[in-house]
Every structure is written in C-alpha cells, then in structure tokens.
C-alpha cells in the first residue's frame, strides 16, 4: 500500500469464516487505538517510500445504524449483538457509526478530522438507516 496505493480501506480483521459483525471478540479487539496504530504503521511505510502521508486517502468499514431517537432500544440491541456492553461503547468503536443523524454526522466529521478517514463502506443495520443517512447525513458532506 505504501508503494502504490491511492486509497486504503482499513477494516476490522476477519477470520474463521466470519466477518466482524459475526465475530464479537474480533469486533471488541478492533479499537480506536488499534486503528490509530495501523494508520501510524502506514505512515511509517509511506515515510520509508518517501511518499507524502497525504498521498493515500483512508477509508473504513462500519456498521451504520441511525435512528431519530436518542438511546433507541433498537440501537442498544444492535450494539449488544456486536458484543458491546452498551450503545455508547459501540459509538466509540471504529466498527460502528450509530446514533441520531446529528450524532452520526458529528462522528464522521470527528473521525475525518482526528484520524483522517475520508471514506466509508457501510453495512446498513436497519431499514430506516438508509433513508435517514441519505436525507439527513449525506447532504452535509456533499
């Protein structure tokens, strides 16, 4: 990636025939600190190749669940199904973008500014997530 890539998606580990959504231990191990460590490693390799760190745009993979209700029980249940003890813990994980449209917008912006992630591949967790994302979140980034 450091030698050739223009975009790199840093995603949770997969293994044993399961993705992060179905592998609670892997989901819980992939923390913001682990993500930052992976980005730091990429930056080290870019430095070794004499490429600017900004030459590789970063993307991620996340489960997205949006609700108009703060602390929505459905989102709480999704967080627990992923292995988190509560919604707040899931919201602080790089594998999830969950909450109200304003919360998700703020988290995408925070991750963009603080971590450098510009793109996401998302898995939509609820039927209403797509509509809320298209109507209330996406326009803020266009």
Feature locations, PLM:
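Active-site-adjacent structural elements that line small-molecule/cofactor binding pockets in enzymes
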Residues: 1-142
């Amino acid at each position: 990636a450091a030698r050739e890539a223009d975009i790199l998606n840093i995603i949770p580990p997969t293994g044993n025939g399961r993705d992060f959504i179905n592998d609670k231990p892997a989901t819980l191990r992939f923390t913001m600190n682990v993500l930052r460590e992976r980005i730091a490693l990429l930056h080290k390799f870019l430095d070794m190749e004499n490429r600017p760190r900004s030459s590789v745009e970063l993307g991620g993979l996340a489960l997205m669940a949006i609700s108009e209700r703060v602390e929505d029980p459905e989102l709480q249940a999704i967080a627990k199904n992923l292995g988190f003890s509560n919604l707040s813990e899931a919201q602080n994980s790089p594998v999830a973008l969950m909450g109200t449209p304003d919360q998700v917008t703020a988290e995408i912006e925070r991750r963009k500014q603080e971590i450098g992630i510009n793109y996401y591949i998302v898995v939509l967790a609820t039927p209403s997530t797509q509509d809320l994302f298209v109507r209330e979140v996406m326009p803020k980034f266009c």
